[in-house]
Each structure stands twice: as C-alpha cells, then as structure tokens.
C-alpha cells in the first residue's frame, strides 16, 4: 500500500503459522481496520492462503503480505504423539520471515509517523529487528488464556506464594508440550523484553483475576484484555448463500438437544479411541454432530490425501437421524450459535473455549496438549461451565465408551447439566454486555486504539 504524508499509524500483524493463531490475528486485524487504521498481515504464502480460506469475514481492508520461505517437509499427523510435532518443520520454516519482515518494517517506518507491530508471542525472534527503528512500537499478542500465561510466569518464578491470590491446581507446562517445543519457547522468551506491552484475546469478565495477575507480573508494561475477538453474531449462510448441510439438520432438532463434538485442527486420535468415541456417542442416545477429520499438516495444500477414519461397521446407518458425522471443515461458530446446540465436547483450544463461552454453550472437556489442560481447568473448576470427559492425569489412557457415554448424558440430560448450562448462559450475557457501548471490553479496546493512535 502506498502511504502518504498524512498517514499517522500503520499496524503490522505477525501470527504464528497454525490455524489457532492465524484466525484470532485476522479477527484482531478486522477490528483495528474498522477504526480506519491501515492494517498489514504477514505470513508465508501457504499460511496466508490458509488464513483467507478459513476466515468468515471480508478481508478487503487488510493488506496481506505473503512471503516465500524455503521448502519444508509436511509429514502427516501421528496419533501416537502427545504433541503435534509434525508441525514443527513449518514453525522452523517461518523463522525465515525475519528478513522480509525487517524490510517491510523499514519501508513502512519511513512513510508513517508510527508503526505498531503486533507479533505472536511465538514469533518474537522473527520480530526482533523492530528494535532497529525508532518509530516502531512492538506489542506481543498472546493467543492463550490469561490463566495459562499467568501460570507460565508463576511456574518460571518457582510458584511462590501470592498475596491475596490462590491459583487453581493447574498442570505443569512440562507435561503439556514436547521437549523440542520447550526449547523453542525458551528461545522466543529471550526476545519478549523488547515489547511495549501485551495483548490478550480474553475479557476481564471471563478472566479478570488472571489479567490483574499478569499486570503484576509484567514489570510495568501495559496489559490489554481486548477480547473475545470472536463475532457475537454469525450468519447461517456464507456470502454466496451457501448453508452447510449440518445447519439444515440442526434446524430440525429441539432446542439445546445436540452435543457438538470437535477436537480442533492439531489433534489426531488413535483408531481405537475413535471406535470408543463412536460407541459412547451411540450408547448415549443423545443427538450429536461429530466433526471427524484428521489434524492439519504444516502445509494443508500439499496435495496429499488426509487420513479417513474408520467407524464401527454400520455406525452411520444406526445413528441416522440421531447423529451426523462431518468429515470436512465445519462451520463451528454457526453450529455453536444455533439454538439446537446444547453442549460442546472439545479439546479446549482457547479459540474453541471463547466461541463456546460467548454463545453460552456448556463444555465437555477433553484436553490434548499445550494450553488445553489449563483451559479445561478454567472451564470446569473456575468458571464452572463445563465437566470433564478425560482427566489430564489419565492422558495416556484410552477413554472408554462408557466414560464418554456417561459424560454426554451428564451434560445433556441431568440436573447437573442444566445447572452448568444456566451458568454458561449467564456468563454469555455478561460477556455480551461487556462488549456493548460502555462495557469493560469495549472500553479496553477503545483504550488500546487511542494508545496506538495518539
């Protein structure tokens, strides 16, 4: 984009190359661009294409910069891995964005009063050359929950007693990620000291105490809780009038009668776990939509065929009318927004948690890796808007069909489930009010926009 002398502020966003990071960065881009601020979004050719493909809103007011990186292997997901290590080659390839990002910063900084670089916390090393430009301010976007990040800081400090604060019992980070990724995180943390402040996709309504704790931990730097970024209203049909078949199926179901089952874009389940899950859903006798697709590869466009999971013989025929199996990309926000959806069995990725919380849908938690076990604690123990399917302490074990059946029934047809659902709806209403005119989230976003536009 050609800039002119009147240009005051330009914002450059630099996401980490996985779906759970690409999308919230696009959502934030959309919100900033709506304030008549020039927004640039940077990534590899592959991941810019992926981000656009899976984003719901128009992106015409966002300037994309797709840079080539050296070829990298894109192995299939390995369901035996506790962590999605198959994605690490794409992470390493993205390190080559440092040079083109530096050149783009040089170009933008020469034409604007101020360049605001918002980099993913996992792209801190790529963003390091921002320090070379006097009119570039750098902010770190944490796409994780405030509880998760505060837990990281607290753990690094040796878990000292905190005045007037009690942490829930959360898993150690070491058990949630691989040793290789731990080294990667350590390398990124070396560059966090150059930040002007931190941004979180959360709300003080959802995580107020943990946002305040982060402010205590942040050495005087600003902390903004700008979320949730997920849109509160979504259309059943896309821009050309297409409606996913599962939405038509939902239209025929009773209110709050369907449990939605999806484990995100980085989880690959073992074949025997798929069999148990299918049996558990069938035996629960509850209506369900089950998204059954393999985890993303580092390059989702490499042309290789994704694994097709085998279900028990005759399963889809037996559950016809009761359940729907979706083997492609599903419109998750639309499903969660539908009045027939009454529960969400989830891996507890933070984006999925926020989408569920903003729609008042209670969760059945089944954490897999990374921040997910801590998010599950937030949902079940802190907010009390969900129940546990798989306990993190039993993460190496197969979850039996009977355990799955029991969890689904508890959420969907018991008094306990009804109480959880009432709390979820109450929290949804509080979140929505916070995003209305005068609400705490709306005011925090206005504060951030005023700060970078000053």
UniProtKB/Swiss-Prot annotation:
Keywords: Glycosyltransferase, Transferase. Its EC number is 2.4.2.40. It is an enzyme of class 2 (transferase). SUPFAM superfamilies: UDP-Glycosyltransferase/glycogen phosphorylase. It catalyses: zeatin + UDP-alpha-D-xylose = O-beta-D-xylosylzeatin + UDP + H(+). GO terms for molecular function: zeatin O-beta-D-xylosyltransferase activity. CDD domains: GT1_Gtf-like. Pfam families: UDPGT. PROSITE patterns: UDPGT (PS00375). High level in young seeds, less in older seeds and very low in roots. The keyword Manganese does not apply. GO terms for biological process: cytokinin metabolic process; protein glycosylation. Utilizes UDP-xylose as the sugar donor and catalyzes the formation of o-xylosylzeatin from zeatin. Does not act on UDP-glucose. Belongs to the UDP-glycosyltransferase family. This is Zeatin O-xylosyltransferase. It comes from Phaseolus vulgaris. The gene is ZOX1.
